[in-house]
């Protein structure tokens, strides 16, 4: 395949993509999903590769320009996700570049910064000693270290008005400002990891007690060096001895930042389902095994056990080698479901929402991208999760208006979930005690299959509701006497 020409999506409010030529020295790095820096008019912009080996339109052959940079590292999305991104672009009338910018979490994207570079005139001025003083010093710095940002130049000359000097040099044509990639906003976290080179159970002769203690600690798997420091006295000395005898290895490795921490509850078994829950799970399971697109609306009263249906369906998807995406309308609602899903599926669960730090978002995205977390739980933006083998999408509280994004790419996560499931042959399961009218109508018309849980677990009654006519209370009263007495009783009961 000819990889000399690529298509790039740029985050601009213009339709279409742009063709660029890849220089020979960069062609080995080309892949869909990689970030690139390209010239665009007089600017340098960062975008994403969306096609490789494209046929160049005849009218562009003479004017095509070269790619300037390609970011190292893994691609951030694949062709599977690109199909979904293109649909979003077409349906919501947003450029493909803007869709991709919205989809990729902040911690994964590279950022551009303004870099100062010498022009040919600037290089001549230095050679001919036409520039002197503070201007000459800045030019000499840029000659020795090309491509510096304003902050880096300020650090070298803290007592100078660097911005004024650079503006003067730019007006004289001695330097120019360009956009360059600075790398991801959040870099991988690397820590020192110790791993045993001796197979578990194999006896090693002439070990000191401390050495045997360390090997026993490593029998279950690699450990962070910092975690062992508080458990073994004089650890550094004993580690050096074990390394010298080739019994352990110490290396700097990428370690994920975990937004939730290790599960504090042991993995639990699934409770026994009610007949109504069993019927719902059976229907979803059959669709999962068929491996074709299906959509379900789970209408269940509050307390009827919809969450347990989600958990059981997720277990079926995992058994089939497929992945599950669970959407909730708001970040605040993720905590409850997160505890339940992590209890059932432990470290296989990843969390995605804007409340995470950039580093956490980057690490969770990469865990999902690498297939290490087959269950993803998150708010609206988790619909973009880079799942390659998506089998089930759960949309909890599908009626909630928070699924609608009101800025930028104005997508509705529930509607996007239905289309993503359709594009990937997955099953979408939407649940609510009060379904949206549009969803319920779709179910009545047969577009969605209606599943119902009309009864609460153990036939528990719904909480009583009393309507108080506040017109009968004194003017200015906010809390009625019955509510005040109920609050007092609740506080007294602890």
Where are these regions (language model features)?
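Accessory, non-ATPase domains that flank or precede helicase/AAA+ motor cores in DNA-metabolism machines
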Residues: 1-432, 439, 444-460, 492-493
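Short amphipathic
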Residues: 464-471
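Conserved interdomain hinge at the start of the Helicase C-terminal
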Residues: 474-494
